[in-house]
Curated annotation (Swiss-Prot):
It comes from Magnetococcus marinus (strain ATCC BAA-1437 / JCM 17883 / MC-1). This is Methionyl-tRNA formyltransferase. It comes from the Bacteria. It catalyses: L-methionyl-tRNA(fMet) + (6R)-10-formyltetrahydrofolate = N-formyl-L-methionyl-tRNA(fMet) + (6S)-5,6,7,8-tetrahydrofolate + H(+). Attaches a formyl group to the free amino group of methionyl-tRNA(fMet). The formyl group appears to play a dual role in the initiator identity of N-formylmethionyl-tRNA by promoting its recognition by IF2 and preventing the misappropriation of this tRNA by the elongation apparatus. It is an enzyme of class 2 (transferase).
Amino acid sequence: MTAWRVVFMGTPDFATGTLQALLDGPDTVVAVFTQPDKPVGRGMKMQKTPVKQLAEQHGIPVYQPNRLREAEAVTALRALRPDVVVVVAYGQILSREVLEIPTHGCINVHASLLPRWRGAAPIQRAILAGDAQSGVTIMAMEEGLDTGPMYSTVVQSIDNHTTGGQLHDQLMAAGGGLLVETLARIKHEGLTPQIQPEQGVTYAAKLKKEEGLVDWSQPAIQIQRAVQAFDPWPCAFTLWQGKPLKLFAASVVVGHGTPGEVIEVEKDGFVVACGDGALRVAQVQAAGKKRMSSGEWLRGHGVKQGERLGEG
């Protein structure tokens, strides 16, 4: 069967996994749409999106409209005559006009087992909620937010130590392979999508940096999940001597004390009392420092038993 003309729409690192899988597959990526370059860092230097960088490495034309709804962008997309548009974390809403351009529609790679965790931050929300599994869903796009019928899914387990970064990488790898396999099944088997269940719908709100601030009055298990989910961004953090202290690699332990109180200092970690139970912290990152083991940090700074974290 003739290779399909694919237009890819995506922006962050997560989307590069699917783009690379398409480039390695049997279809032809004729163009990429991604968000405009943005100034970053102290020097405000313009930075290309990860998807743009990968596309340019392969000589693929790149389009970066401020709004995909603009007439110029719609005209450009129509001129590409796509058989299918593949969308992965693009960051823009696709209008009905855009959705109707490709012959076989627009297909989305979403990092959750829909209908659970529709929305912007499904990876972190799944860990925060204590879900035992996540996954990737390939769906046909419609105007609603992640509401389209589903072609296929793949499941990824989440354990007590899975971080947001680890789950991101696992789903990024799984999503690319599943998308290529699904496109082949649509072409060769006439695979049709199934309507999403009406039960079990949840929404994954966009992450905000301030969500990382630890509330020590919460149960230890909830704080541990936040430490996992927010690694590597936005990072769970507390205040120590009035400065931010990022927390990593935490585990729930038995312990009692005033929430935020350091109740035990060990050679390779420290234990903080929570609203219910306690949290052992194995890695930290102090302001202006690199990430390090808690043992290394303790040798240099010496947080004392009885000190309170979270106080400005």
